[in-house]
């Protein structure tokens, strides 16, 4: 699978929704959730910089658009992301950190999640860390 160079993070897709996240109006973050929920993983990966990374729970970071698209295609099918609210913070070098909390629903379970995005000055995703917001007991019950 290769990521088309002409996929722009701002391209509108047929699956564009009226997604809103309280406290967040950053288009690239909104597109991340829209494209993930639409199963458009190559388009999601195109939102990342060339050396961008995504770090799923309990895993090492996955680097690069193609690797991210392949990972999402294998692991994210059927997930429904429901971001609720977030906060944005300006950092040095014109970077922005955005934290969003919400829920991920799979066919088997739902879990509260935090997404932490680091955006470049060019509004590309440099890094996304996904954290489960569950107690150890809740995590153990997911295995049953």
Residue ranges and their predicted role:
Residues 45, 55-56, 84-85:
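Short, hydrophobic secondary-structure boundary micro-motifs
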Residues 7, 25, 54-55, 81:
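Selective for proline/serine-rich intrinsically disordered segments
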Residues 15, 53-63, 78:
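A short gly/proline-enriched turn/hairpin at secondary-structure junctions
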Residues 32, 44-45, 52, 64, ...:
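Hydrophobic pocket/interface hotspot
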Residues 33-37, 48-60:
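Short, solvent-exposed secondary-structure junction/capping segments
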Residues 1-38, 42, 46:
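Short, low-complexity N-terminal intrinsically disordered segments enriched in polar/charged residues
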């Amino acid at each position: 699978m290769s990521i088309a160079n002409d996929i722009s993070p701002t391209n509108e897709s047929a699956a564009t929704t009226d997604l809103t996240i309280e406290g967040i109006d950053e288009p690239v973050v909104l597109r991340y959730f829209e494209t993930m929920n639409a199963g458009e993983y190559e388009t999601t990966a195109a939102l990342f910089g060339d050396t961008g990374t995504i770090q799923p729970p309990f895993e090492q970071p996955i680097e690069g658009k193609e690797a991210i698209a392949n990972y999402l295609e294998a692991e994210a099918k059927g997930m429904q992301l429901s971001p609720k609210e977030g906060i944005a913070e300006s950092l040095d070098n014109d970077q922005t950190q955005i934290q969003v909390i919400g829920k991920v629903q799979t066919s088997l379970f739902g879990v509260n999640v935090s997404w932490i995005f680091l955006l470049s000055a060019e509004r590309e995703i440099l890094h996304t860390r996904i954290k489960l917001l569950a107690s150890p007991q809740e995590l153990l019950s997911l295995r049953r």
